[in-house]
Amino acid sequence: MSLEVNIEKKLDGFTLRAAFTAGNTSTALLGASGCGKSMTLRCIAGIVKPDRGRIVLDGRVLFDSAQHIDLPPQQRGVGLLFQNYALFPNMTVEQNILCGLKAEKDPAARRAACAEMLRAMRLETLAKRYPAQLSGGQQQRAALARILVGKPRILMLDEPFSALDSYLREEVEGEVGSLLANFAGTALLVTHNRDEAYRLCKEMIVLNEGQVLRAGKTKEVFADPQSVAAARLTGCKNILPCTPLDSRTVRLDGWDTTLRLALPVPAGCTAVGIRAHDFTPCAADAPNAIPVKAVSTSENPFDWNLICTSPKGTAQLWWKVGKTSLSAAAPEPPQYLCAAPESIMPLKG
């Protein structure tokens, strides 16, 4: 299965220009709140009409402004899980699931499909309960069951963990991960959480103010986000302004030091990104050594955060150090930190 999207939609403050393809796998749409991620899903589902463009699913045109094609949602074969799950409050779990089988006219077949989905989603004992009687995780499973029973060609999840308490997220995330891995089709996950995107999806699309900044395999996007905005959205703490010297070398502005990169330095490179965990203490003459002065140390349950500045205090970077135990002592403040050439990401913008 494959999805092709190339649409425009004018929104408050910017114009959404979503152009991407998604194959038979799980793909994350990563971006800040209000960047157009959820609107993109609504356009694919047929809930919102784009101003112009084209949406094609498995060779079947769902929307084409030039050809005046705009299939209604019920004809698109799209399953969309809303942030609040959108269960019908006056219907039981079983009745909600049956709503996903309106196209099936045989009563016996409808009952059998509903029973099978109740078993698959571990909802058999909750079939007669109403949404208000369910936990957040149970509500999500019921909403997913209602979607999946209709056998959609594409599954889209809009911030599926946003309505859950933090203690439930890990458990439910594991269930959603299994669902995405086993779904026989295209799956899109909207999130602003880079960790969720990394754990759950093999492919990633990074959006910012309605524009696709970067698309590709998730690990490749994290390793080479290509732009300052995409690096920040993937959680890079250190965006260090630089001046390119040659195709593999840059000078860090404010640090009086040069860095050698494994990736080629592109035209228009204005900064390098180095993730906070990728630094190690080193000697002054080590490759890619950066002179630093630690000015702040804070402790998390599983790591230490050190904020360092250049010797003259004109620039700043973050260093994260993993802890071997909860009682591990803080690391000694370094005089120099270095990063391997493979860990240094050239960035535009």
Explain the meaning of each model-derived region:
Residues 38-41, 141-142:
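ABC ATPase nucleotide-binding domain helices that frame the ATP-binding cleft
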Residues 42-43, 203:
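The short alpha-helix immediately C-terminal to the Walker A/P-loop
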